[in-house]
Amino acid sequence: MNRRLDNARTIRAPHGSDLSARSWLTEAPLRMLMNNLDPDVAERPEELVVYGGIGRAARDWESFDRILGALRDLGPEETLLVQSGKPVGVFRTHADAPRVLIANSNLVPNWANWQHFHELDRKGLMMYGQMTAGSWIYIGSQGIVQGTYETFVEAGRQHYGGDLAGRWILTGGLGGMGGAQPLAATMAGASMIAVECTPSRIEMRLRTRYLDRRADTLDEALAMLEAAKRDGKPVSIGLLGNAAEVFPELVRRGIRPDIVTDQTSAHDPVNGYLPAGWTLEHWAAMRERDPEAVALAAKRSMAGQVRAMLDFWRMGIPVLDYGNNIRAMAQEMGVADAFDFPGFVPAYIRPLFCRGIGPFRWAALSGDPEDIYRTDAKVKELIPDDPHLHHWLDMAREWIAFQGLPARICWVGLGQRHRLGLAFNEMVARGELSAPVVIGRDHLDSGSVASPNRETEAMRDGSDAVSDWPLLNALLNCASGATWVSLHHGGGVGMGYSQHAGMVIVADGTEAAAKRLERVLWNDPATGVMRHADAGYDIAIDCARENGLNLPGITG
């Protein structure tokens, strides 16, 4: 029996103010775990897969049920421990300790590879938590859309004078992360062709309004692109096809996109990337029969796609790796110059990280969209002098469809996050929100990840692979009073390539919550400033001094 497959279940988080657990501090992780598996949120909820290839919310359905049971029973001075999606212990701690501690997919470095992970996975001893799948703070494609938007806008500033009108972006992948790309592109003023091999993913992005059109052939997609250019309006097109075939074909035809990237699940060559020339049915059968052959065929196909991306790069077209480790896979297959084009963080995002700015997110546990709209207004009130942020919030309200529990993301940094958290808590206390909110972030943040091919690529001091930083981030968030804290391995880029930490904190309107919020939402982004200041970035050093951080040898 497959303990991970249950087509009979439909999971949706409870809404409203009635509790099924003993407090909001345990009701919150319960609802957010369930929300991760809402069919409007998750990629394959019947298999517990949230996004990112095989990124799961729980190890199997028995573990899922036991986690819910433990959360319902958990006391105010107890902490639940979760090991790779399985509840393993409840211990007496204290009221300000995290209610849940999560460790997902962590392996001793010498064994930190997909082969060993899959051996353990088959034995039922481990699961892949991705970043926010196994840490119960995934909010659908909105979770990455602003970061993608910021990246495209910055690329437009650097390469096209700040104007992407009439230009188009080529990419691959419309999964949980890649699905944000089409909306981010049109928000930034550009059109997009996003190549996706799975029809259901295209349909999901159309249904949730992240995508405008579907094309079944490259010629059809190009015709749609030309029509949009004539009309003067950006359009996003989901092209049913294989990026490994479409990218080289565009090179052969001499067709020039204006920006090229990729968000296929290349980090997982067995489950995440369709080899060139294969059907979906053959791929599924081969994954069961010979996963090693699948991985080899996928990596060879990735090499072909990266060669095409390098061809675009040599034409002078901006090309960026969007953090799925496709360059490393291609390099493994003999593409020696795979890293000639940059990753998106060193190219466009690092100055934000130096100031602790990253993907701050919150969700309304009530299920009421009005709670999000009220918090949107509060963000504008508290940060009145940031027109770019206000523009983002206006666009988000107009364009972004909520998936599951209503949620919002906006990139804010040190000195802003704790003020917002305290304000949201006060809104709950005054009854301006109909239930508490949870506040969290992606593991892709300034101080919470070590990933040499993504977030920490090309660090100034060469410390790309030093993973002490996310460990310190997790420890500090525990000490500061986060409601749940997670420590993962392999998210985004695959086994052996990253370690990262997450935190979530509940604003329930109490004085105790206010104290925790002030500590956590100051300390968490401050670790990002610390990490970048330690690496020698002047922006981070200045930010640390401006905010009075005590960094021995740097600010002292």
Swiss-Prot record:
Subcellular location: Cytoplasm
GO cellular component terms, A-Z: cytoplasm
Catalytic residues in the record: C410
Function: Catalyzes the conversion of urocanate to 4-imidazolone-5-propionate.
Lineage: Bacteria, Pseudomonadati, Pseudomonadota, Alphaproteobacteria, Acetobacterales
Name of this chain's protein: Urocanate hydratase
Family membership noted in the UniProt record: Belongs to the urocanase family.
UniProt xrefs under SUPFAM superfamilies: Urocanase
Catalytic activity: 4-imidazolone-5-propanoate = trans-urocanate + H2O
EC number(s) stated in the UniProt entry for this protein: 4.2.1.49
